[in-house]
A protein has these predicted regions:
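Short beta-strand-plus-loop segments that form exposed binding edges in beta-rich domains
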Residues: 1
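N-terminal carbohydrate-binding/catalytic regions of secreted carbohydrate-active enzymes
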Residues: 53-167, 384, 402-470
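Ser/Thr/Gly/Pro-rich low-complexity, disordered linker/stalk segments of secreted
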Residues: 5, 10-53
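Structural recognition of the beta-strand scaffold that forms the well-ordered cores
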Residues: 64-67, 90-94, 125-130, 177-182, ...
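Surface-exposed substrate-engagement region within the catalytic domains
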Residues: 76-80, 241, 245-422, 426
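Substrate-binding cleft of extracellular glycoside hydrolase catalytic domains
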Residues: 102, 117-232, 249-256, 262-267, ...
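Surface-exposed cleft-lining segments at the edges of enzyme active sites
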Residues: 93-100, 201-208, 235-242, 295-309
Length: 470
């Protein structure tokens, strides 16, 4: 049944909001942070030598991208993993301790020093995920964070300020720093913070106390003041914000946060979509304008009245709306393609049958999830497009922000000291909730805590990679 309901005469979508969003970024993101978090301590700073502080329109053009040696070692240790272990992935700062390194792992300065070595005489981008807001991940449990809902001052003084101080070191001024700002946070305020079946008490709290907004504004302001830092705000994905009833309010929310509490639109290089999620860059076999026997594909259960069927069309349309709302015309979009390839034997090779609109869409779509609101350790997923600079109009890069092989969340309750709860969306036996239209989760079994290494998933991602691995 399409997860659609009417609120004050406006048609809304349950899945649109929390589902994929609530979790996908959050939890998948979160965990990613969780695992790589500690060591991935950090960052992207500015590098020594080179053209110090010369800002460019797209930091990825003409530059190498930092390969995190800690992720690379895990990937290379897997059978067949050396085929991708040299790919650049983001470093997740998912807790205060990650700044200096967790459990003996690399901290922020360690990553920046390594980045200077990788840079050589050319240009290099270091990708850093800022992910430690108060009351983090309010619509999911797999990647809850260390800071309570009211710990905004701690977030500023013990998290953002130390990161900004390190990134400001002249030693790193020649590096290009791409920062992904707080996955899931602002989209959760739009769809899960009151008045919808997907709302959670935690998101209502974070909307009412304003600390997500204050935190993101502060991060934009402090990091945006550093000449070689390029801030990209997380903007959910098409299966979360692709409905008009969500996209318009999301753009307004982004504009509000980028122009308050000291932040300016000049602090924003762009936005990122599909962070730690599984939505394809492009659906090659069908378009949103297709019809079957006079019925638009938007009426199918899969599309569920969404305006988009894939991430690139969503990102390009959102970019236009953001510029119209006052953001600079030079902003660019990033798309996380780390796990959205959907290759392998189950990948359709052409359009589905025209027997019904549902048969057509289900037979056409390369996204083989049970529901677009499913975000945790998805069965059948594969590595997506390899990181690429300027692949399409308005798109700064395809990036691997979520490091492949890091779990989105545990498939059963696991005691831990990382603050990570058990989210039933990671349980393959769970029947679902409002955020995924009450469908099965499609999650892989035997998954470890968010961010921890999940060998079985890594092997599946390689097996189902698209383009295939050679």
């Amino acid at each position: 049944v399409p997860a659609t309901f009417t609120l004050d005469g406006v048609t809304c979508n349950m899945d649109s909001g929390g589902g994929t969003g609530g979790g996908t970024g959050g939890s998948t993101g979160g965990d990613t942070g969780g695992g790589t978090g500690g060591d991935t301590g950090g960052g992207t700073g500015g590098g020594g030598g080179g053209d110090t502080g010369n800002r460019v329109d797209n930091p990825y053009v003409g530059a190498k991208v930092y390969v995190n040696p800690e992720w690379s070692a895990k990937a290379a240790a897997e059978p067949g993993g050396s085929r991708i272990s040299n790919q650049p992935t983001a470093v997740w700062l998912d807790r205060i301790a990650a700044i200096n390194g967790v459990n003996g792992g690399m901290g922020l300065r360690d990553h920046l020093d390594e980045a200077l070595k990788q840079k050589g005489s050319g240009e290099l981008v270091v990708q850093l995920v800022i992910y430690d807001l108060p009351g983090r991940d309010c619509a999911a449990l797999a990647s809850n964070g260390e800071l309570g809902p009211n710990d905004i001052d701690k977030y500023k003084s013990q998290y953002i300020d130390p990161i900004a101080a390190i990134l400001s070191d002249p030693k790193y001024a020649g590096l290009r720093v791409s920062t992904v700002i707080e996955p899931d946070s602002l989209p959760n305020l739009v769809t899960n913070a009151g008045g919808t079946p997907t709302s959670t008490d935690a998101c209502v709290t974070m909307k009412s106390n304003g600390n997500y907004e204050k935190g993101v504004s502060y991060a934009l302001d402090k990091l945006g003041a550093i000449p070689n830092v390029y801030n990209y705000i997380d903007a959910g994905h098409h299966g979360w914000l692709g409905w008009d009833s969500n996209l318009g309010p999301a753009v307004q929310e982004f504009a509000k946060v980028a122009t308050s509490n000291g932040a300016s639109v000049n602090d924003v290089a762009g936005f990122i979509v599909n962070t730690a999620n599984y939505s394809p860059v492009k659906e090659p076999n069908f378009k949103i304008t297709d019809t079957v026997s006079g019925q638009t594909v938007r009426q199918s259960k899969w599309v569920d009245w969404n305006q988009y069927v894939d991430e690139q069309s969503f990102a390009q349309a959102m970019r236009d709306k953001l510029v119209a709302a006052g953001f600079n015309s030079g902003i660019g979009m990033l798309i996380d393609t780390s796990r959205d390839g959907w290759g392998g034997s189950a990948r359709p090779t052409g359009p589905g049958p025209q027997t019904s609109v549902d048969d057509y869409v289900n037979g056409s779509r390369i996204d083989r999830r049970i529901h677009a609101g499913n975000w945790c350790n998805q069965s059948g997923a594969g590595l997506g497009q390899r990181p690429t600079a300027a692949p399409a109009a308005g798109i700064d890069a395809y990036v691997w922000v979520k490091p492949p092989g890091e779990s989105d969340g545990a498939s059963s309750a696991v005691p831990n000291d990382e603050g990570k709860g058990f989210d039933r969306m990671c349980d393959p036996t769970y029947g679902g909730n409002a955020r995924n239209g009450n469908n099965p989760t499609g999650a892989l079994p035997n998954a470890p805590l968010a961010g921890h290494w999940f060998s079985a998933q890594f092997q599946q991602l390689m097996q189902n990679a698209y383009p295939p691995l050679s």
